[in-house]
Amino acid sequence: MASPVMTYGIPGALKSFIDRCQPFYMAKYYRQQPLIKPDHAKIRRMLFICIGGMDKDDIFTGPVLTAKAFSDIIDAKYADELLQNDMDRIGNIEKKPEVLAAAYEKGFALGKRIVDEREK
């Protein structure tokens, strides 16, 4: 999942999508009928990529908590994250090739892990 930070949270469209998953939360925790079968849930993973404009370390607290809650609801283990603040000053992520490289590496590693676990 990828998202910018908007006022210490995730943008409305993505948040609305996540909020629409409330029935899956209820099915999983109250009715004990999760949407994802346990054998499939064990291989599901989430990588959270998030950028923020402000040069503050705490701007990711809300988005990370939301992403972790969402990953739990959809039975996708929160496997990793890539967070980049100070984008108002940086301007273009292409000015941070190390961040682009990290995004590629983390995405590749996540995909490899899923494939490896599926083949077990």
PLM feature spans:
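Helix-loop-strand module that forms the ligand-binding subsite of alpha/beta enzymes
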Residues: 1-68
